Amino acid sequence: MINKKKIGAFVLAGTMLLSMGTTVFAAGEPTVPNVNQNGQVPITKDFEMADGLATPNVTFKFTATSETPDALPAMIEDISYAAGDKGTLKDEKYVISKDTAISFQGTWSHVGEYVYTVTETQDPANKVENVTYDSSEYTLRVYVVNKNDNLEVEKITAEKAGTKTAKILFKNTYAKKDATLIIEKNTTGTYANKTQQFDFTIAFTKSPTESTLGEFKGTITRKGNNTSEPVITNNGPYNFKLADGDKLQFTDLPVGTTYVVTENGAKDDYTPSVTVIENAQETVKDRVAQNEEQALSTQKENGEKNLIGENTNKVTFTNTYKNVAVTGVIMNNLPFILLVAVAIVAFVSLAVMKRHIRSEKQ
């Protein structure tokens, strides 16, 4: 005869094992996000662009296409942006977030699962230039159940590329590659050498909407010369020379690109100054080097690099030759003048001595 206590122990152990197994299974089951909000599904639109761009007038449309018979029509309100909309800086890009929602029109006919495909609609007739559209597809599953003698939406799930997600998000990028940067050189001073060339270095940093820096092309135009010299920068800093009236112009730059131009210091009796215009705004005005041997940079006081916007971008370096004494004596020629003076003094002294000797003989 089997001991009742032993039977009880076996039953208790089995119950505990079953309970543990059930707990482990529940803990391992992934939680599926429910995107249902009172029978609607929110959609977020992130419109991103680099600094230096004005927000364009653009409207984004969406479609929820039914994949299940007897499914209700799904409606989605458009999202529009206009000039003046301001974004929030995120990952070096300005992002303007707006929301809409999917709503279902009518009454569900029966319980079950209803499947929809949600996409962003590209309207060729209203497509805005330089805007990249999002080609993402979301699968929406709507679960309808009986509740209190009525048909209600129990939950709604969304998935992208086979993975469940808690949010339907579409991203669009606005990027332009038509900006221009001009770097020009001037010299001032009565004795300034208008043909003397000065050494410069420019270093670019890619726009946050670009994946790589790439190469930038420009031309140097020399004063009084109808020919131009091609310039190609490739990732690293680029060195160049400019004299009075010369100009380096870059074209087709991605808006949002940043840069720093430096005039190398030299002991040449010239003191450089610089003025910078970024996206039609003057950000550096008549900054002067402490002395002629100090390199002069366009970098802003807060350490930020200079921005290339969709409007005017221009750097003007002006080198001023040092003041000359009122006598008109140029210090570089002083040694020669002293030699001439010594020779004259020696000649006069010799003449006086000869006259004195002649006087004594008489």
Features from the language model and the residues they span:
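Solvent-exposed loop/turn and edge beta-strand elements of beta-rich ligand-binding domains
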Residues: 2-362
